């Protein structure tokens, strides 16, 4: 097998069965998207005009009034928060992230206060926001959301993520209704979501996506929504967004990646994964089945349960050996403490699932020696 470019640099080969994670480079970009990126990198353009044109093109896919491409989804959160606080006023933009004396509170659910590799609160603070949590970790009510709003409130933030608490939380409809009743912008962090239109259609004012996750774009993100608020986002380029700027090549790459996505993506079904699950279950001490994404997306994964008493190793041991081999195999490890890890097929290249099964078999055989 021909070494990839990272192996040529002296780094390990990685099999990514973890999903579209930043720590592993997020996603694999299609050749035609990279070709567009290369062409964009080799020419000059008026950046302001490119910002407007790419915003228009992105909005064709989202159904929004306008859009603004960012360097990543995390930058999008900071920029959207700054937009909500400053309303695009140049004097205020120049002061950010110092929002002293401004309405700067961002109201969110405690069950949505997550860490995706960095705390979401870091991005909010970077945009000048002060976090106001609503509810408890496992339950939030409409009256709690309403009572958190005052003259210092700048925006409401709704986070849609598999990291969030999935039960006992308020719905997007609750947030839309409360935001509109109080004439406040609603920001939705939909970084890894695949539905380009639903969140805008729900009534959100600024919806943030990662370009590199669901859409397999080069490193990028975008904010899509109401024209007045997107204009306020664009104004941040003369403030905090300058340190988060994205290059012309990745702006073009995102547009081409969205076109690819719009034309249709191949998905791995539960039925297609079943033979792999059966092969893993044939290994002593391992039991595999198929699970759907915890946030309800149409994503199917193989869940592997480790019987430590049978195998002689616990789930943490197996995951560590997968990662520590000659080929580093990364699995999803959110449930390791429950004796479970998962394999996400979306980022596994052809032939690599067989290598994963073979490595699991090897680990089990060595444990039996």
Swiss-Prot record:
Inducing stimuli: By D-glucosaminate and DgaR.
Keyword DNA repair included in the entry's annotation: no
Keywords assigned by UniProt, alphabetized: Lyase, Pyridoxal phosphate
Domain of life of the organism encoding this protein: Bacteria
Modified residues (N6-(pyridoxal phosphate)lysine): 213
EC id: 4.3.1.29
Record-level Gene Ontology MF annotations: L-seryl-tRNA(Sec) selenium transferase activity; lyase activity
Reactions catalysed according to its record: 2-amino-2-deoxy-D-gluconate 6-phosphate = 2-dehydro-3-deoxy-6-phospho-D-gluconate + NH4(+)
Cofactor section: pyridoxal 5'-phosphate
Signal peptide (from-to): none
Lyase among keywords: yes
Coiled-coil portions: none
Stored InterPro entries: DgaE-like, PyrdxlP-dep_Trfase, PyrdxlP-dep_Trfase_major, SelA-like
Function: Involved in the catabolism of D-glucosaminate. Catalyzes the conversion of D-glucosaminate 6-phosphate to yield keto-3-deoxygluconate 6-phosphate (KDGP).
NCBIfam families named in the record: glminPNH3LysDgaE, selA_rel
PANTHER family membership: L-SERYL-TRNA(SEC) SELENIUM TRANSFERASE (PTHR32328:SF0)
Family that this chain belongs to: Belongs to the SelA family.
Name used for this protein in its record: D-glucosaminate-6-phosphate ammonia lyase
The species this protein was found in: Salmonella typhimurium (strain 14028s / SGSC 2262)
């Amino acid at each position: 097998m021909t070494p990839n470019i990272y192996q040529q640099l002296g780094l390990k080969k990685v099999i990514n069965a973890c999903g579209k994670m930043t720590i592993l480079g997020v996603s694999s970009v299609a050749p035609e998207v990279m070709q567009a990126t290369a062409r964009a990198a080799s020419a000059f353009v008026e950046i302001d005009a490119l910002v407007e044109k790419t915003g228009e093109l992105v909005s064709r896919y989202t159904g929004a009034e306008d859009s603004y491409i960012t360097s990543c989804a995390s930058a999008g959160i900071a920029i959207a928060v700054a937009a909500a606080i400053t309303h695009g006023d140049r004097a205020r933009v120049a002061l950010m992230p110092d929002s002293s004396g401004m309405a700067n509170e961002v109201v969110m659910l405690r069950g949505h206060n997550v860490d995706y590799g960095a705390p979401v609160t870091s991005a909010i603070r970077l945009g000048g926001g002060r976090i106001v949590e609503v509810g408890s970790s496992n339950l939030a009510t409409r009256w709690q959301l309403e009572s958190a709003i005052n003259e210092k409130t700048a925006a409401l933030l709704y986070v849609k993520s598999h990291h969030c608490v999935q039960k006992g939380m308020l719905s997007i409809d609750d947030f839309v209704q409360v935001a509109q009743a109080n004439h406040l912008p609603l920001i939705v962090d939909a970084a890894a979501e695949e539905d380009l239109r639903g969140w805008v259609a729900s009534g959100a004012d600024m919806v943030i996506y990662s370009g590199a996750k669901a859409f397999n774009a080069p490193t990028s993100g975008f904010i899509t929504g109401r024209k007045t608020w997107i204009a306020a986002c664009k104004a941040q380029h003369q403030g905090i967004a300058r340190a988060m700027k994205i290059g012309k090549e990745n702006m073009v790459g995102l547009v081409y990646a969205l076109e690819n996505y719009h034309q249709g993506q191949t998905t791995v079904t539960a039925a297609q994964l079943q033979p792999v699950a059966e092969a893993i279950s044939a290994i002593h001490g391992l039991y595999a089945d198929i699970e759907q994404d915890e946030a309800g997306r149409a994503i199917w994964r193989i869940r592997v349960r480790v019987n430590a008493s049978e195998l002689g190793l616990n789930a943490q041991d197996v995951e560590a050996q997968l990662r520590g081999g000659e080929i580093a195999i990364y699995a999803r490890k959110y449930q390791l403490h429950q004796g479970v890890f998962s394999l996400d097929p979306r980022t596994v290249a052809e032939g690599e699932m067989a290598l994963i099964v073979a490595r699991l078999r090897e680990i089990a055989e060595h444990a039996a020696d």
